[in-house]
């Protein structure tokens, strides 16, 4: 089956009900853990598959224990990263991996699950191996341009790999790789109200550091705030919960928030966003058509955030700077120049829009239906 035919079939099948001989709902296990970039797309898919019985595979004490909706029973296993070099620690990791595989196999078998959907990351390794051992279909979604280690190593065990960026297909030599975009939370697809006392016709800068925050960006930004507010900007700064200096600066036009419940409203209102370059945040910037300044996290695995950011830079959707090259003076100047040029911001907005796949959640749900109906 060719790539085009495969994509056509999965889109056509989305509106079909999941069919079983017993008329019981299809049971699907979703393996997604760790960060918002892994969890939010998986939650979007789960919410789209209302005719399925869905349960979740996660890790204790990770973000999923707080974010996963209560209607999805949560199973937990212990997983950890793979070592770069062979040694005694590698053997320990492999031993624990085998234990995790056996536990996932037990969950899948006892629960009589009919398939696995995963968004990659370390939890995907034992989940994929266990599912394939039992002969169950596996759908893997990779949101980053440069696929993670687990995706690269285990994609051939999957029935299909869906990628969030079209550029990502060239890094996977696997014929059943399809570009479907990355699903976003439903609120990003509809107008949201911002419940902060900000006047309507003022420029708004939003600073975010991903679901974990970014102390380095916070420190950089705080040195620029006085000049920005002096030039009329209002600033919403989501600092994350690990910044000891989060509330060190106060100004009526500056809102400091460790966490904000409705990121969609922030991005929709923002004239400019300053952010890391995680795939989840970039997808949200694309669907809200929001101009951005991106500062890729320099210690991300395989420098994958730089690959994500390059796509936005190539489409004129963002300005991209490394953390090392960006001084407070440079950031201050770049932001003020953008805010003073509606033409530049409009061009960046159109660039972001060109990268959006707003129906990704429907396409990916269609893919799940297609694979599990065979």
Swiss-Prot record:
Question: Per the record, GO CC terms?
Answer: plasma membrane
Describe which pathway this protein belongs to, using the record's wording.
Answer: Cell wall biogenesis; peptidoglycan biosynthesis
Q: Keyword check for Cell membrane, yes or no.
A: yes
The record's Gene Ontology biological-process terms are:
carbohydrate metabolic process; cell division; cell wall organization; lipid glycosylation; peptidoglycan biosynthetic process; regulation of cell shape
A family per Pfam:
Glyco_tran_28_C
- A single Gene Ontology molecular function, please? undecaprenyldiphospho-muramoylpentapeptide beta-N-acetylglucosaminyltransferase activity
EC numbers for this chain: 2.4.1.227
InterPro entries documented for this protein: GlcNAc_MurG (IPR006009), Glyco_trans_28_C (IPR007235), GlycoTrans_28_N (IPR004276)
Which keywords, in A-to-Z order, does the entry hold? Cell cycle, Cell division, Cell inner membrane, Cell membrane, Cell shape, Cell wall biogenesis/degradation, Glycosyltransferase, Membrane, Peptidoglycan synthesis, Transferase
Say yes or no: keyword rRNA-binding present. no
Membrane-topology descriptor: Peripheral membrane protein
The subcellular location is:
Cell inner membrane
The record's catalysed reaction(s) read: di-trans,octa-cis-undecaprenyl diphospho-N-acetyl-alpha-D-muramoyl-L-alanyl-D-glutamyl-meso-2,6-diaminopimeloyl-D-alanyl-D-alanine + UDP-N-acetyl-alpha-D-glucosamine = di-trans,octa-cis-undecaprenyl diphospho-[N-acetyl-alpha-D-glucosaminyl-(1->4)]-N-acetyl-alpha-D-muramoyl-L-alanyl-D-glutamyl-meso-2,6-diaminopimeloyl-D-alanyl-D-alanine + UDP + H(+)
Q: Which residues bind UDP-N-acetyl-alpha-D-glucosamine?
A: 35-37, 144, 185, 211, 305
Q: Would you identify the family this protein belongs to, as annotated?
A: Belongs to the glycosyltransferase 28 family. MurG subfamily.
State what this protein does: Cell wall formation. Catalyzes the transfer of a GlcNAc subunit on undecaprenyl-pyrophosphoryl-MurNAc-pentapeptide (lipid intermediate I) to form undecaprenyl-pyrophosphoryl-MurNAc-(pentapeptide)GlcNAc (lipid intermediate II).
Q: Which NCBIfam families match?
A: murG
Q: In its UniProt entry, what is this protein called? A: UDP-N-acetylglucosamine--N-acetylmuramyl-(pentapeptide) pyrophosphoryl-undecaprenol N-acetylglucosamine transferase
């Amino acid at each position: 089956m060719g790539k085009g035919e495969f994509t056509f079939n999965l889109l056509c099948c989305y509106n079909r009900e999941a069919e079983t001989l017993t008329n019981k709902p299809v049971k699907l296990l979703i393996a997604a853990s760790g960060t918002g970039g892994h969890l939010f797309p998986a939650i979007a898919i789960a919410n789209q598959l209302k005719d399925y019985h869905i349960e979740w595979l996660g890790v204790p004490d990770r973000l999923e224990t707080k974010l996963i909706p209560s209607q999805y029973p949560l199973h937990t296993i212990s997983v950890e990263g793979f070592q770069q070099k062979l040694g005694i620690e590698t053997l320990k990791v492999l031993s624990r991996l085998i234990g995790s595989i056996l536990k996932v196999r037990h969950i899948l078998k006892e629960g009589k699950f009919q398939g696995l959907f995963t968004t990659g990351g370390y939890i995907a390794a034992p989940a994929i191996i266990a599912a394939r051992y039992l002969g169950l279909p596996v759908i893997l979604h990779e949101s980053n341009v440069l696929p993670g280690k687990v995706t690269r190593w285990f994609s051939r065990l999957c029935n299909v790999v869906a990628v969030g960026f079209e550029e990502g297909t060239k890094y996977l030599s696997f014929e059943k790789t399809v570009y479907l975009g990355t699903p976003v939370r439903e609120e990003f697809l509809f107008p949201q109200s911002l419940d902060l006392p900000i006047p309507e016709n003022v420029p708004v800068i939003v600073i975010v550091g991903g679901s974990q925050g970014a102390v380095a960006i916070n420190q950089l930004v705080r040195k620029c705030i006085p000049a920005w507010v002096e030039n009329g900007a209002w600033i919403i700064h989501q600092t994350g919960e690990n910044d000891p200096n989060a509330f060190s600066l106060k100004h009526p036009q500056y809102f400091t928030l460790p966490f904000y419940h409705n990121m969609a409203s922030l991005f929709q209102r923002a004239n400019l966003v300053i952010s890391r370059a995680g795939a989840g945040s970039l997808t949200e910037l694309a669907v809200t058509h929001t101009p951005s300044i991106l500062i890729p996290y320099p210690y991300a695995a395989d420098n994958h955030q730089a690959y994500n950011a390059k796509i936005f830079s190539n489409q004129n959707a963002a300005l991209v700077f490394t953390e090392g090259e960006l001084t407070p003076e440079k950031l201050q100047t770049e932001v003020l120049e953008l805010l003073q040029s509606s033409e530049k911001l409009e061009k960046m907005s159109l660039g972001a829009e060109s990268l959006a796949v707003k129906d990704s959640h429907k396409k990916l749900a269609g893919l799940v239906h297609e694979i599990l109906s065979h």
